[in-house]
Amino acid sequence: MSGDGEDELCRNALALVNELCFSVRGNHNNEKCIEFSYLLRDRDRTRHIETDISVSLLSVIVTFCGIVLLGVSLFVSWKLCWIPWRDKGLNPQRRDSQHHPHQHLHHHHSHFTDLTVERVDCGPEMPERSYLDLESYPESGIKLSQTSPDIPVDTSSGSKENNIPNAHSQQQVSAPPPATRFNSLPRPIPQQLSSPEFGTQADEKVEQVTSIGQIKPELYKQRSIDTEAKKHQKVNCGRINFMLRYTYTTEQLVVKILKALDLPAKDANGFSDPYVKIYLLPDRKKKFQTKVHRKTLNPIFNETFQFNVPFNELQNRKLHFSVYDFDRFSRHDLIGQVVLDNLLEFSDFSEDTTIWRDILEATSEKADLGEINFSLCYLPTAGRLTITIIKATNLKAMDLTGFSDPYVKASLICDERRLKKRKTSIKKNTLNPVYNEALVFDIPNENMEHVNVIIAVMDYDCIGHNEVIGMCRVGNATDGPGREHWNEMLANPRKPIEQWHQLIEEKVMNSYMTKSFAAGTGATKPVTIVVESPHSV
């Protein structure tokens, strides 16, 4: 049985016994009933006492909390009100005591005839020289600054001939604090003034200086030379180790990138995510790229690449290495580069030749995003534009594996609006995808002059947003290869016109389109090319 039930049963039993004892006549004098009545009174008295104790304990707690809150409020008010008021009351006296000498000094600057100098008893009584009294230093020169020459003071002519007070010159003198600071007051050095060399030096300075503030070219010549030397000096950004071998039978140049050492840190964690791009100059038709190595400054690659180069062209070819730092959500940072020329010298080695080269810092390099090859074909009678995406080469690596998952998206733009979009399939883990896929748009013949097409190469990501690798544009309102390709298509209807296009960055295209539209280029109404952001896919 629960506690509440037992209490209720006890109350009922007590009420019943009370009724039996005092309701029936003759039981008032019964000893048992009288004893029971005393027990009831004691029980009620105990209950009242417990109630009083609980009430008194609660009042004590409330009183204590009130006292604590009162003390905290008094302490806070003392901190906020009393201390600032006390400091405010004491500040005027401190300011008067601290700044009185300076105020006295500035007060007398406008009245130079009333300038007084305090004296110090240091043995025999000697006149104390004021730091504003130039006549006390008849043979010394005025020092305007650390770089300006010393100007001797002419006591005879002085400032009387020019009607200029001495105080104007004195304000420019690099002087120490006033005369009240006895120990810090500079004194003329007798040895320097009395030495025979001092007079000759002063005469030379008088001949060299013709006016105050004259610039000495020799002071800045050395700095300019150092600056030019720093500009021409290239910073070493580590070293790279690779092997070369030329096979005469197949006319192939075999390059094996072994490792790199002491690369600079490009990330906030003190490391880099390096990879190497390699290609032959000057055409750059074929480019290779190593895998990305995470969080290291001494990557080990051990990757081999082959270039088909005839033997008679080795002398005019150069091998170009570019070391990059991989960034997932921004442009890759160029760490440095190495150019190996005169490859004919290394063709004499039939076996692998290990070569070490210093990686030199490169200030900037044009973004190499790759190229795309597609054809345009328009049928005027059907009003149909067919864009055949053939392939892309040398795309930028967007994944840590050193590859990308590219697909191509074509957007049809007219009057600042995207009308339609088409896209190809996704090619996994490649930088040279081959598509051969046709993207068809229905465009009336009269609207061909008002449309543009954006070709964007995207990198597909399973998790997150797809990113733009690079893009190009074709249409009547474009410039360069895009406009030439479009005009050639219109001049040759029902015939596919194939052409290669260089991919550019999204921000570069947007800035160029903004400038061209502001200048009003193009024969037709300017059409804003809206490049679809990867966040909208």
Curated annotation (Swiss-Prot):
Basic residues compositional bias, start-end: 100-110
Keyword Transmembrane helix: yes
InterPro entries per UniProt: C2_dom, C2_domain_sf, Synaptotagmin
Polar residues composition bias: residue spans: 143-174
Residue sites binding Ca(2+) 3 per the record: D327, S330, D333
Disulfide bonds: none
Name of the protein in question: Synaptotagmin-C
Organism: Diplobatis ommata (Ocellated electric ray)
